């Protein structure tokens, strides 16, 4: 069915474009390679900028139309009064509408993967498929989880500005970073039913080992939460489990991610 539907609002080739897309009280930095290929929209990790996708995009090549953007207060985008998950979902609307994209493949890493599930659940006719990179329906929840996350970001408060130029932190306070993460954990943990009802092809590429702030074995426990989803929804498939960790998966295992995108785009 995906091969019989136009991916954009026009049959003409889209022009390459870089600029700012206004939404709510802010503006998002967007890059669009243009072309006549299937649009692929990349959704970043919670505090990451679009540059982390460079190797994946280079591996896929110019046959696809690659659209990246920086979320609010990340990368080159402007700050906002609203950094909520719902605001991030609205940002996907704004970017696709601004670029005239009717239907796309969503590729999301970590936070971006959870965004992709929920946006697809709400907009199934606008999504050809989803590639999820090391996200899972699992999270640190409740008061204990929230307190642990707040303590982590409080300890990191002096490090965050130093990592920002490398696309690893946002122009937010440590407390704002923590609140983004607390909300993500609550939403991710409740997302199993969302994944189980998706009717678009969803491919997972998952990492191995731990990530920043996780306890030993915690990330592998999170990844096992996908097993019931794979069993209950044939549209959701494990494409690859790779050797790199959560932080390095885009830079080290980009070929596996590209293969999953090609499978959806075929």
Predicted regions and their residues:
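Active-site loop/oxyanion-hole signature of alpha/beta-hydrolase fold enzymes
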Residues: 55-58, 67-107, 111
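Flexible "cap/lid" loop of the alpha/beta hydrolase fold
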Residues: 117, 121, 130-160
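Hydrophobic, aromatic-rich cap/lid helix
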Residues: 165-202, 206-215
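Short beta-to-alpha linker loops that shape the active-site pocket of alpha/beta-hydrolase fold enzymes
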Residues: 70-74, 136, 244-245
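Residue in the alpha/beta-hydrolase core beta-strand immediately N-terminal to the catalytic nucleophile
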Residues: 105, 128-131
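Conserved HGGG/HGGXW glycine-rich cap/lid loop of the alpha/beta-hydrolase fold
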Residues: 26-78
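Post-His helix in hydrolase/transferase enzymes
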Residues: 249-262
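Conserved loop-alpha-helix segment in the C-terminal half of the alpha/beta-hydrolase fold
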Residues: 208-244, 253
């Amino acid at each position: 069915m995906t091969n019989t539907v136009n991916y954009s609002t026009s049959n003409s080739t889209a022009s390459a474009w870089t600029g700012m897309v206004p939404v709510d009280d802010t503006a998002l930095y967007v890059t669009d390679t243009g072309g006549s290929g299937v649009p692929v929209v990349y959704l970043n990790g919670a505090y990451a900028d679009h540059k982390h996708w460079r190797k994946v995009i280079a591996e896929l090549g110019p046959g696809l139309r690659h659209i990246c953007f920086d979320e609010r207060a990340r990368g080159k985008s402007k700050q906002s009064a609203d950094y909520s998950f719902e605001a991030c979902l609205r940002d996907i609307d704004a970017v696709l509408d601004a670029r005239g994209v009717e239907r796309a493949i969503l590729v999301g890493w970590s936070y971006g993967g959870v965004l992709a599930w929920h946006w697809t659940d709400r907009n199934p006719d606008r999504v050809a498929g989803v590639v999820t990179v090391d996200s899972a329906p699992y999270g640190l929840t409740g008061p204990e989880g929230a307190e642990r996350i707040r303590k982590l970001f409080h300890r990191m408060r002096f490090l965050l500005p130093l990592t920002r130029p490398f696309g690893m932190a946002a122009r937010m306070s440590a407390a704002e970073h923590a609140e983004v993460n607390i909300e993500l954990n609550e939403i991710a943990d409740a997302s199993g039913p969302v994944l189980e009802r998706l009717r678009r092809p969803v491919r997972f590429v998952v990492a191995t080992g731990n990530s920043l702030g996780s306890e030993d074995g915690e990330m592998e426990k999170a990844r096992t939460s996908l097993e019931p989803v794979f069993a209950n929804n044939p549209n959701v498939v494990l494409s690859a489990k790779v050797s790199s960790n959560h932080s390095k998966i885009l830079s080290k295992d980009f070929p596996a991610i590209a293969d999953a995108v090609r499978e959806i785009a075929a």
